[in-house]
Swiss-Prot record:
Molecular-function annotations in GO: pyridoxal phosphate binding; transaminase activity
GO BP term, pick one: capsule polysaccharide biosynthetic process
Organism of this sequence: Campylobacter jejuni subsp. jejuni serotype O:2 (strain ATCC 700819 / NCTC 11168)
Catalyzed chemical reaction(s): dihydroxyacetone phosphate + L-glutamate = (S)-serinol phosphate + 2-oxoglutarate
Species classification: Bacteria, Pseudomonadati, Campylobacterota, Epsilonproteobacteria, Campylobacterales
Protein name as it appears in the record: Dihydroxyacetone phosphate transaminase Cj1437c
Keyword annotations of the record: Aminotransferase, Capsule biogenesis/degradation, Pyridoxal phosphate, Transferase
Length: 367
């Protein structure tokens, strides 16, 4: 039986084969999907162990974990728990938002290049997506974006801040003005990397019911395997979303892990500080390695950097043979790759291997 017409013509979200799971993982440095490079907080490990021994594993998960929702609201310092809902990661939140707020005739605007799953999901259900492309330096022209919204009659705009894959953070006041000035457009602000910047539009959700923020525990909190995230939005939107959202979808172990992580915020903050230091040192190394300028986008504020190289496939393959997995982004940005940032010790090892590559190639050649 054939898939429906939308799926037949869909360009899928391009993931990568996970060779890591088919090899020995003891000597691997996974820097391809922007996960944390350290284990979760010891609080998380201990809480999971306790639940495995004493919890009701034969029950469905808590469908309205008020304690966890309150903890998240407290963490935001802006709202109460009526503005929060849990999801099994940001992806499922994006999928639910598309299904709840859009009709087939609506148009989605996507600030690109960006995380591509939102586009894939929308196209998969027959909704048109239109890209608003950043300039050559990956800067965002807000006046042009507002014109684009009106000209294309955009119903929903997806904006990742900080941007993935560039790591750039956009002017938060200009984002807020855009949301306030366009009350008939739904804005999805993907704040997956919020912890690395502390910049948010969360203070707008009480006054603006055209705003949904998506966040995740997969990055700074080191809970990627648990697949848990949350949205922040006006209670009216939460009510609409919960008409479709499956309340049993977030596993109990994931809820336990998220709650424990929020009880040890210092662990997360220490890791974020370490990554910030490692990123600055790594970018400094890259800039000394290259000649001719350009190529290294040193204004990333997140836990990754985007770099370019003339022989990007060769570069990615070389690091993979050394047990370092990074993300080839050539399908979206020609001859570019994204490298997640770990600890200073980890990135020192990566720098050593990149230096070996450059020596073999007679330099680190930019495009």
């Amino acid at each position: 039986m054939q898939a429906n017409k939308n799926i037949q013509k869909l360009t899928p979200y391009l993931s990568i084969p996970h060779k890591i799971w088919n090899s020995s993982q003891s000597n691997i440095l996974k820097l391809d999907w922007n996960e944390a490079t350290i284990p979760p907080s010891p609080y998380v490990i201990e809480s999971i162990k306790k639940f495995l021994v004493n919890g009701n594993l034969n029950w469905y998960p808590n469908t309205k974990n008020l304690y966890l929702l309150d903890k998240i609201a407290e963490y935001t310092k802006q709202i109460n728990s009526s503005f929060v809902e849990l999801f099994e990661g940001s992806d499922s939140a994006h999928e639910c938002i598309i299904d709840v707020f859009l009709d087939k005739c609506d148009k989605i605007g996507i600030v690109s290049p960006t995380y591509d799953n939102f586009r894939s999901r929308a196209n998969g259900v027959g909704i048109e997506t239109i890209s608003f492309t950043l300039d050559d330096n990956f800067n965002l022209d807000f006046d042009s974006l507002e014109y684009f919204i009106h000209e294309k009659r955009i119903k929903l705009l997806y904006l990742c801040n900080p941007n993935n894959p560039t790591g750039k953070s956009y002017n938060i006041q200009k984002i807020k003005s855009l949301i306030i000035n366009n009350p008939n457009v739904m804005f999805i602000i993907d704040e997956a990397y919020y912890e690395f910047t502390s910049q948010s539009v969360c203070d707008l959700v009480e006054q603006c019911n055209n705003l949904i923020i998506t966040r995740t525990f997969s990055k700074a909190f080191a809970l990627a395997s648990f697949r848990i995230g949350y949205i922040i939005s006006h209670p009216e939107n939460i009510e609409s979303i919960n008409k479709l959202r499956n309340p049993k979808s977030v596993p109990m172990l994931s809820q336990i892990a998220a709650n424990a992580a929020l009880e040890d915020l210092q662990y997360m903050r220490d890791y974020v500080d370490e990554v910030s230091c490692a990123r600055m040192e790594f970018v400094k190394f890259l800039n000394t390695l290259t000649t001719g300028g350009g190529g290294i986008f040193n204004d990333s504020v997140a836990n990754f950097v985007l770099i370019q190289n003339e022989n990007i496939s060769l570069f990615v393959g070389f690091l993979e043979k050394e047990g370092i997995f990074i993300r080839n982004y050539s399908h979206l940005i020609s001859k570019n790759c994204r490298i997640s940032i770990g600890t200073r010790n980890q990135m020192s090892y990566v720098a050593e291997k990149i230096q070996e590559f450059a020596k073999k190639q007679g330099g680190f050649h930019l495009v």
